[in-house]
Design a protein with these regions (language model features):
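Long, contiguous binding/interaction regions
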Residues: 2-57, 61-98
Length: 98
């Protein structure tokens, strides 16, 4: 059975994809999946369409409908709940490797 999951994804994007020029970053993601591994596989395949690479996922869990995730993520969850094919990407926070 699939549920809506939430994760924090660390992603490598192509040079020039972000205004900062940075190629590493992270974002919150919501999507339907049947397991942690299913989420990882589906998200990797989705990002590959943009030639982006999933580096890691963290804080991955089925959403808790009683928890307030904040305005942006709550909206992402609502949109994901309405569309079982949805993959919602939150704000991308880029960084430079140290």
């Amino acid at each position: 059975m699939e549920n809506v999951w939430i994760t924090t994804a660390e992603i490598q994007v192509q040079p020039g994809d972000m205004p900062s020029g940075d190629t590493l970053g992270f974002m919150r993601v919501t999507m339907w999946a049947s397991s942690h591994d299913d989420l990882h596989q589906k998200l990797s395949a989705y990002l590959a369409k943009y030639q982006w690479r999933l580096i890691s996922i963290d804080r991955t869990a089925v959403i808790d409908s009683s928890f307030d995730y904040g305005d942006e993520v709550n909206q992402m969850i609502d949109e994901t709940l309405r569309d079982q094919n949805a993959i919602r990407l939150g704000t991308y926070y880029s960084y430079k490797p140290s």
